[in-house]
Amino acid sequence: ELYSKHEESNLGQIIADSFAYAVDSVDVAVVPSGTIRDTYTKGDITVEDVYNSFSLGIGKDGVAGYPLISTYLTGKELKLAAEVDASVSDFMTTARLYSSGLNFTYNPNRMILNKVTDCYLTKEDERIEIQDDQLYHVVTDLYTGQMLGSVNKLSYGLLSLEPKDKNGNPIENLEDHIIKEDGKELKAWDAIARYMRSFDDTDGDGIANVSKYYASTHEHKVVDDSKNIIDLIKKPN
């Protein structure tokens, strides 16, 4: 489903929300479809299931699983990330992005790199307009951070997403920005497991139940399929 349908995914959403849950003061958490290796079936979800869903890679510590990293992007770059998803991921389905904190609407009928018609942040269900020059705290896994940093090269300089530190300086080595707890890397799969454990036990069996919130989607990524000429040319970006 992640590759066949270009739309919001509750699987991608729960993983993105897991990253945001695991780290303090996050504006946006990003998960591309290419890093998600398995889904969750109805019934008990084990730690093994969680690990299998995000089992790619190895950290600087030599332990299996990509760690989370802490970076910053400008508001303009966040909008560009949404546009990369809207315009490029139909050709490169592994680049489909699922995010926590970033919402956007796109029209697949518009010109390439001009498909996003609305893009904004959310916090506690409140809409927050994106300021192009402001730095925003972005959490993702190490592999995704490396891929974001390669957008400039892959697009021959047409697009640029440059991960930065909190002072706005370009990051030279993303491994220096791995999130650690007590000296240990915080793995992406561990962040997901923690989030799963944080849910309420709604049936009294002593095991947390996945929130019903994830039984549906919530307009984090909205597809506007209008072919009206006005809708196709308004709000050029």
Residue ranges and their predicted role:
Residues E1-N237:
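Catalytic centers of hydrolytic enzymes
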